[in-house]
């Protein structure tokens, strides 16, 4: 009798995705981040659900309800800090996952890549709205500044912003709808993840060599299940170290001050994982230009497959492209640092140079490097 896991309609899908899936025999730890992202998403939905049981999305009680969670709810502080720091772990894994895709040329799987970009945008929107919910100073002013960027859209901008706010400023209506969206979007993300995997399993995974691995596949279980479990344990270890020893390390102290529309904090800045984009936004002295640059800083990923000039898929054997890739990583770290600095000399100049370099590497230098490497190899 055939095994039930291969016969049952539901078990069959799980079996073909996680058990009997033919996987390349040489995928490295950089391929762990997909499953780590799934772990992060599950953790965020679970901790978020328990937080939502105690949270109230009203301007008068939101801040107090978060305080109540931390002080009075059994292990509420653990749940709250796991959720807040879980978001940081989520974005670390996200950026590593995208970086892996860039380095090894996984963007040649265009459908998977494009769904990934949509996922990235959705997760960024979810995280932004989540940051508004505790209703501290940085929550309120972050929401005000970021939503206000939409007013740069010609003609409809102002109406659009007021429509999103549900009034003439960030207020009760804004907080309530942000909570509603913050609750629903992770489930949208889950659905998109399924589509992401559907497209991935149409082609199979890429691998570090960039060469087809059809002739050398191994079953996903037990080889990669055990590898993924090890990765997940390391992820949870790092997360719990953060939660237990320095839960506020990555947060902003201003968010422990209740939101006050009458007093602006000295430095309005988003969470650390948005600082690189915030730095690009601020480096352009024109409002609409800044907003476009902010959008393009992520949307540029969509045209990466079109800019691939090399005859090799990954960068494993392409030293010039490797140098540019790590320069890009360093540049993004510099932008992240700049995003958290005040708008004054020399930070403005450094931010502008780093922003120019970011777009130059992706749009100009990497395609040129691909052509040079082809010529060196006489291809």
Swiss-Prot record:
It is a multi-pass membrane protein. The chain crosses the membrane at residues 33-53, 77-98, 113-133, 178-198, 226-246, 288-308, 320-340, 347-367. One of its GO terms (cellular component) is mitochondrial inner membrane. The keyword Membrane applies. It is found in: Mitochondrion inner membrane. A ubiquinone binds at residue 201. The keyword Cytoplasm does not apply. Its cofactor is heme b. GO terms for molecular function: metal ion binding; ubiquinol-cytochrome-c reductase activity. Heme b b562 binds at residues 83, 182. Heme 1 (or BL or b562) is low-potential and absorbs at about 562 nm, and heme 2 (or BH or b566) is high-potential and absorbs at about 566 nm. Belongs to the cytochrome b family. Component of the ubiquinol-cytochrome c reductase complex (complex III or cytochrome b-c1 complex) that is part of the mitochondrial respiratory chain. The b-c1 complex mediates electron transfer from ubiquinol to cytochrome c. Contributes to the generation of a proton gradient across the mitochondrial membrane that is then used for ATP synthesis. This is Cytochrome b. It comes from Arctocephalus gazella (Antarctic fur seal).
